[in-house]
Regions:
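Alpha-helical transmembrane segments of multi-pass small-molecule/ion transporters
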Residues: 1-304
Length: 304
């Protein structure tokens, strides 16, 4: 059942990505427009998704589940970072960054909510927050090879962290937002999947097919990101008692997502190989339509 839902949802995402590609090729979506959409996603859509996920009744069971999801997220990232460093080290910063950091925000959250319902975003939000923290610390060191480039302000003052703090405050205090605000946030949050996939479609339109399909190293990066890391993460979750059940599956779905769009953003920001980063994002996203369903099929036998 989970595999079928996941396969359906990833296929929907693929169609949306093709829509973005068509809009770009016909001139209806420009580079400037794609950047604006990315900003809307980062500064409006994702915060609404995270805050809404915490608008639920406080219980000790949910609090325990939230803490466990954070612990499992740390374990998943430990696997991803270790594997990426062993394979790429500091020689290939884009490949290291891209395989270590997944697309938990734009792909993981909608997939988790499609499989387990909107309340499941409550647990995957902690995964996305830890991802954000690691990208702005360890990720910066990978990309720039310089520790002094870490911006402490951006580590803590960013849309994901701020929305997490607001969400936790609402969850712990039990404060309910007015219906009109809640409905507005729900409408904005619903843009997450369509907007993110359309932006990815724009990225795909900028890549030459030859560069995308005839580079063996890109296939290796996709294999590491989509097969090796998720399967090792599954093994770790199988060993850890808390890794079994719904929270373990949520963690694995997030950890099995393709190369994060942040790889292209960071590459452009810090003067690295932007075109390669875009190719990694696009190729791994295309392959993830199949690989995520396979990984989840195995996970149902191991940790559910």
């Amino acid at each position: 059942m989970i595999t079928q839902i996941l396969l359906t949802q990833t296929f929907i995402m693929f169609i949306l990505m093709i829509l973005g590609l068509i809009l770009s090729k016909t001139g209806l979506l420009t580079e400037h427009g794609s950047k604006d959409m990315a900003n809307i996603l980062l500064y409006a859509v994702i915060p609404c998704v995270i805050i809404r996920s915490y608008i639920t009744d406080f219980t000790m069971e949910k609090l325990y589940g939230l803490l466990m999801s954070a612990v499992l997220a740390v374990a998943a990232f430990a696997v991803a970072i270790a594997v990426s460093y062993i394979i790429y080290g500091m020689r290939k910063p884009i490949d290291n960054f891209g395989t270590a950091f997944c697309n938990a925000g734009f792909i993981g959250i909608p997939l988790v909510t499609a499989v387990f319902g909107n309340e499941a975003a409550f647990y995957v939000a902690s995964f996305a927050s830890i991802l954000n923290l690691l990208q702005w610390t360890y990720g910066i060191v990978i990309i720039t090879r310089r520790k002094d480039m870490i911006n402490i302000k951006k580590v803590f003052v960013n849309p994901v962290t701020i929305s997490l703090v607001i969400g936790l405050f609402l969850f712990i205090t039990g404060i309910k937002l007015p219906g009109v605000i809640n409905s507005t946030m729900a409408g904005v949050a619903a843009l997450n999947t369509p907007a993110a996939m359309i932006v990815l479609g724009y990225y795909l339109s900028c890549v030459r097919i030859r560069d995308l399909l005839l580079n063996p190293s890109l296939y290796l990066a996709s294999f590491v990101r989509l097969i090796i890391i998720p399967l090792l993460t599954l093994l770790v979750l199988y060993i850890i008692p808390a890794g079994h059940g719904q929270i373990g599956m949520i963690t694995l779905i997030a950890a099995a997502t393709p190369v994060g769009t942040s790889t292209a953003i960071f590459a452009q920001k810090f003067g690295q190989d932007y075109e390669r980063a875009v190719c990694m994002v696009c190729l791994s996203t295309l392959f993830s339509i199949i690989t995520m369903s396979v990984v989840m099929y195995l996970a149902q036998m191991w940790i559910m």
